[in-house]
Structure formats: structure tokens, C-alpha cells
Design a protein with these regions (language model features):
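Extracellular/surface-exposed low-complexity segments
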Residues: 2-81, 270-278, 286-328
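The right-handed parallel beta-helix/beta-solenoid scaffold, focusing on the short coil/turn
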Residues: 9-13, 18, 42, 78, ...
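Short linear loop/turn motifs
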Residues: 29, 142, 165, 258, ...
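Short, hydrophobic/proline-enriched secondary-structure or compact coil segments at domain edges
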Residues: 49-51, 108, 132
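N-terminal segments that cap or nucleate solenoid repeat domains
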Residues: 53-119, 125, 326-328
Length: 328
């Protein structure tokens, strides 16, 4: 076993006239071998090769067996436990599109990282992601198609760069339920278009100094967004989207407003709102925003009919909110 990256290319173990008599009682071969006991194919998942090259009777044993096995499990559906680091972009055989066409659960059993390609995971049916692991891609970790359901119960999800000014973690056109997790991207971290229906109950949606200025976008008349909790670094509602906010913290620490509404239909009944210094908490370019509750730094955007801003200073996580909107 070695942590040196050149171990596989530098050293070779060759077995000639080798034959396995029988499996040893009580000893599992594991996922890293075929019928040859004691050989760990590789530890490519941790960023280095852990064994020498193995040649058995003139045949070089495949060091990517575990990576291929994992991809096959994803394609087959069902419960897929993640115990190890994986990078699906390492070889052509594992870097193609993976359609989720059966109910599938990706369950991170350890704090490990699954690296996927841009738009590689395409959910067409029902996908649940849970556990303490991490997923990363250059862009578009999850494509959630119309008619599909994506549920995220926990984990950390990072898009590393914006290839088209998006930097998307989830591109949603179906049903998406976010119960918890951290979502980090350099653009519209969570993007909802078409017939998207996203509900956020908790979690942290980060806008990493993006040129867009907003971590969460809802666009189009068929799009529905419901925010019940969590921390979201700014929301953009455009093109007739229907947005309901009843809780959570909505802030813009990048450059613009906590909520930008352009031809959207937004209702606010709760939550905490904080725009970038010098910018409004809520900006209405067009469309409607009915403010019927919540806490705000400023009172520059009119409350809904029958509601008023009341002085109620609160400091939460270092941000001071000066007003609460209440019924008259």
C-alpha cells in the first residue's frame, strides 16, 4: 500500500501459474478484487493509487473495478451505499451520462466525496440523496427532469466553476424537495425553470461571489418555489414564477437585493430579509410581491394591503433587523 501517485506505474507484481483453490472461510473478498484474494485494485478515489500493478498469468488486472461497479449500481437503481471516495471522471467508461430511471437512494455512509461530470447525473424518475458525504462537479451536479422527483436530505454539494455564468448545483424542471444540506456554486446555485416545483425546508444555499448575485432562481410561469426555512444567499423570481416564503433567512452579501422580483408573483409571510449594504431588502422591478409578514432591515418596499411595518429590532447571526411586518 502506498500514498505515492506513481506507485502503480513504477512497480509491478506478476503472478504466474496462479490458481485460487477456494475462498477462505469468514473472509470477504470485498469490492476491490475478483477471484484473487488480498489484492486491492486501487485507491484512486482518495487521489492516489495504493498498489502496484498486478499481472496474473499475463493479464493486467483492472484497477478500476470498484469505480465501474459503483456506476453500474447507480444505473441499476435501488439503495446505493457510498463508503469510499469516487471520481467518475477518471476514465471514459464511467464518465458518461448516468440516467436515473428507477427509484434510487444515494446514501453516504462516511464523509467521503463523489465527483461527477457536468450534467452526468440525470434524474428521470425518483432520486434521494442523504448522509454526511460530499458531491462535486464543475457545473450541474444534478439534472432533475420534468416528471422526476429529487429529494436531498443532507450532504454538501459544490459546483466548482461557472462554465456558462450559471455554476449550478441543481437544475430543476421537476419536483425537488430540499430537507437539508449545503449547496455552493459560483452562479445560480439552485435553478428552477419550466414546470419546476421546489420546496426548501432547511439547508444553506450559497452564492460564492457570483456575477449573478443570486444563489436561487425561479423562472417561468410554470415554476413554483416554496421556502419554509434555511439560509439562502438571495432569491431571484422572474418570468411569472410563483414564490412563497414563510421562513428562513434570505440575504445578499454579494451585491444586490435579498429578493429580486421581475414579473414574478411572490408572497412573503415570514422569514428574515437583508439586502446588500445600500440596496433594498426586496426589489420589485415588475410583477407583485405581497409582504404579509417577516423581519426586514429596511421598510422601503410597501407591505401588502392590511399590513404594516412595526419597529421590532432583532439581531440574528450578526444581522440587525429593524422591522417586523404585522397585520393592522
Amino acid at each position: 500500500m502506498s500514498k505515492k501517485a506513481d506507485t502503480y506505474d513504477k512497480y509491478t507484481v506478476e503472478l504466474r501459474n496462479n490458481k485460487v483453490d477456494k475462498q477462505a472461510d469468514g473472509v470477504a473478498t470485498g469490492y476491490f478484487t475478483d477471484e484473487y484474494m488480498g489484492w486491492r485494485a486501487s485507491n484512486f478515489t482518495a487521489g492516489y493509487i495504493s498498489t502496484a500493478k498486478l499481472i496474473v498469468d499475463g493479464v493486467v488486472k483492472d484497477r478500476w473495478t470498484e469505480l465501474k461497479r459503483f456506476v453500474a449500481l447507480l444505473k441499476d437503481g435501488g439503495n446505493v451505499n457510498v463508503w469510499y471516495h469516487y471520481d467518475l471522471t477518471k476514465i471514459p467508461e464511467t464518465s458518461g451520462e448516468i440516467p436515473i430511471e428507477k427509484p434510487t437512494v444515494i446514501d453516504f455512509k462516511r464523509a467521503v466525496t463523489l465527483t461527477v461530470g457536468k450534467q452526468q447525473i440525470v434524474n428521470k424518475k425518483e432520486l434521494t440523496v442523504k448522509g454526511i458525504g460530499k458531491m462535486t462537479a464543475s457545473d450541474y451536479i444534478f439534472m432533475n427532469e420534468q416528471g422526476a422527483t429529487l429529494t436531498v436530505e443532507g450532504g454538501t454539494f459544490t459546483a466548482t466553476k461557472a462554465t456558462d455564468a450559471n455554476g449550478v448545483v441543481i437544475y430543476n424542471q421537476g419536483i425537488c424537495n430540499i430537507k437539508n444540506g449545503t449547496f455552493d456554486g459560483p452562479g445560480f446555485t439552485l435553478m428552477n425553470t419550466g414546470s419546476a416545483d421546489m420546496t426548501i425546508e432547511n439547508g444553506n444555499v450559497i452564492n460564492r461571489n457570483s456575477p449573478t448575485g443570486y444563489a436561487l432562481m425561479a423562472a417561468g410561469g410554470g415554476t413554483k418555489l416554496t421556502v419554509k426555512g434555511g439560509r439562502i444567499e438571495a432569491i431571484q423570481s422572474i418570468g411569472g414564477a410563483n414564490v412563497t416564503i414563510s421562513g428562513g433567512t434570505i440575504l445578499n452579501d454579494c451585491k444586490y437585493y435579498a429578493l429580486y422580483n421581475q414579473n414574478g408573483k411572490t408572497t412573503i409571510t415570514g422569514g428574515y430579509f437583508s439586502g446588500y449594504p445600500g440596496m433594498k431588502d426586496v426589489y420589485i422591478a415588475d410583477g407583485t410581491v405581497a409582504i404579509q409578514g417577516g423581519y426586514f432591515e429596511d421598510n422601503q418596499t410597501a407591505a401588502a394591503d392590511g399590513y404594516v411595518y412595526k419597529d421590532n429590532v432583532q439581531t440574528v447571526d450578526g444581522i440587525t433587523y429593524n422591522y417586523e411586518v404585522v397585520a393592522q
